[in-house]
């Protein structure tokens, strides 16, 4: 029976073997600390930072609306959405759902809202990466569900720096919780980053990411100057969401950033539903069934 479990696990794609990160001073454009900064790894939903940039730069209708349809379903990992299907929504609400709660369906719908096919939108994402000098970066979908979406911490520094120029990204990065308006529906969504969700740090750029192949990722730039410098922490393949939060907090504090009102990280019961990543209970149930 144990061999059957091992066989099932062998079918699951593996993820990168080591954490890589950069602590970056965005005021003086210099690396403060790093480990394997050019290591290329899957980035998961960190992808959505590029999706947001490409949408904002190519959408010509600031009042656009679009409905989530079956075309926006996740056929890679099987994730779901809290948002209603076939209900026209303001694009700004979809952008909010994507950046605050990392909603995959919203990411797919936004690529259509920009007046392009999904393939055309992804081509724009790769074109933008080349323009920014992100030569180790490749995109295959707009949500980050594909493990073929790859980048490095140093490439993501360039994306983070570019994102600083977008007022919409700056605002949405720091929302701890929000109600998404979809027709008559109002859907509560919380930030996937515990540091923002629990108001431990304010963010000016903030995007988490997780799939099994990537580990837990984060692009984070602190909103408030740290000893007169704007400091960011970009890390890939953290071992857990909790470790990602503590690692980022420790690095920020090491370089002069202070937690809001001296707040610390505490576990909160039931908050797992607000974390990024997809539901792996199906795999766990299958393993239990085979091994039982």
Question: Each PLM stretch: what is its role?
Answer:
Residues 2-13:
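Sec-dependent N-terminal signal peptides
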Residues 16-154, 158-167:
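Active-site-adjacent loops and short helices of periplasmic peptidoglycan-processing enzymes
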Residues 9-11, 51-55, 181-182, 191-193:
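Intrinsically disordered, low-complexity boundary segments flanking structured domains
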Residues 4-5, 49, 224:
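Hydrophobic alpha-helical segments, especially transmembrane helices
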Residues 7-8, 52, 284-285, 292:
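Short amphipathic alpha-helical "recognition" segments used for binding
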Residues 19-20, 24, 92, 116-291:
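Penicillin-recognizing serine hydrolase domain
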């Amino acid at each position: 029976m144990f061999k059957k479990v091992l066989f099932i696990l062998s079918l699951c794609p593996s993820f990168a073997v080591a954490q890589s990160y950069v602590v970056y001073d965005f005021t003086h454009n210099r690396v403060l600390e790093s480990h394997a900064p050019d290591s290329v790894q899957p980035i998961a939903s960190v992808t959505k930072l590029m999706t947001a940039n490409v949408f904002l730069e190519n959408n010509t209708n600031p009042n656009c609306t679009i409905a989530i349809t079956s075309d926006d379903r996740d056929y890679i990992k099987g994730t779901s959405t809290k948002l209603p299907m076939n209900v026209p929504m303001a694009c700004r609400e979809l952008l909010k759902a994507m950046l605050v709660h990392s909603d995959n369906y919203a990411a797919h719908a936004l690529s259509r809202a920009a007046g392009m096919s999904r393939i055309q939108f992804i081509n724009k994402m790769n074109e933008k990466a080349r323009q920014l000098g992100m030569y180790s970066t490749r995109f295959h979908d707009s949500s980050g569900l594909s493990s073929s979406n790859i980048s490095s911490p140093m490439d993501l520094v360039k994306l983070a720096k570019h994102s600083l120029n977008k007022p919409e990204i700056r605002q949405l990065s720091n929302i701890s919780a929000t109600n998404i308006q979809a027709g008559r529906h109002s859907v509560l969504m919380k930030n996937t980053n515990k540091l923002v969700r629990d108001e431990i740090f304010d963010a000016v750029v903030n995007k988490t990411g997780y799939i099994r192949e990537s580990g837990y990722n984060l692009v984070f730039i602190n909103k408030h100057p740290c000893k007169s410098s704007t400091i960011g922490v970009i890390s890939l393949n953290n071992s857990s969401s909790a470790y990602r939060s503590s690692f980022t907090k420790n690095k920020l504090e090491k370089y002069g950033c202070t937690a809001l009102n001296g707040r610390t990280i505490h576990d909160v019961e039931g908050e797992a539903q607000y974390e990024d990543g997809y539901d792996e209970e199906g795999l766990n149930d299958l393993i239990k069934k085979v091994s039982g």
